[in-house]
Amino acid sequence: MITRRKYYEKLQPTKDAHKVYIVCEGKGTEPDYFAFFEGLSSNLEVVVIPPEDGSDPMKLKALAESKFFGDDSKFRIDYQAHDTLWFVIDTDSWEREGKISPLRRFCSSINSEGAEAWKKYSEVKPYSVCNVAQSNPSFEIWLYYHFFEDRPVAEDVESHPSFKEYVNSVISGGFDFQRDPARLEAAIANSKANFIVDEASSPDLYSTEVYRLGEEILGFVNKNLERLRNKM
């Protein structure tokens, strides 16, 4: 099997590298996916922060508060480097339970505070520091769009015990985290083409906002990713 590890050694990020902090609700799939992009560019550092005390959006919010803004904070947003913080979440029952809206409000407050910080750096243009990348029903819809241009057919999905099992069944051999993330550009195009929001402006079924995070990553790794695809 031809993999990224075989053809491309990790590059060490420079001191001033742009950092993308990704707080995700999964401990396996999401970290495995984003690990692919670590070291693909010396100008980008991908930092995945898995859940520690639960995966619901409020627990992830508390985790970010402690990691970035607590007394013993571990990470720091560098506005001059345009660092960003992303929450990668599933819709699950969180929407119904009202746990996603507070997370989006949290990001809005961080972005408002960031506007004040930008004033310290006249050369830094305002940008969206904190972002939510919600997938409906789950992160697996993002994996699905690496291979398919059209939305899933509801009847086909319903014939499987779960959406995750459906995606595993339609991708031959299942999603390979050592090579399939190289299809990032296709995933962005396909998910954007099929992106729909509901009446509450949240991603509708089979829609994902992860393409926005994908676009940010692609901006740094595109050239090396193209070379990697050609070798794979």
Question: What function would you assign to each model-found segment?
Answer:
Residues 25:
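Phosphate-binding/switch region of NTP-binding enzymes
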Residues 1-21, 29-52, 70-232:
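C-terminal accessory helical subdomains adjacent to catalytic cores in phosphodiester-
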Residues 56-66:
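Eukaryotic endosomal/vacuolar membrane-trafficking regulators centered on PX-domain-mediated PI3P pathways
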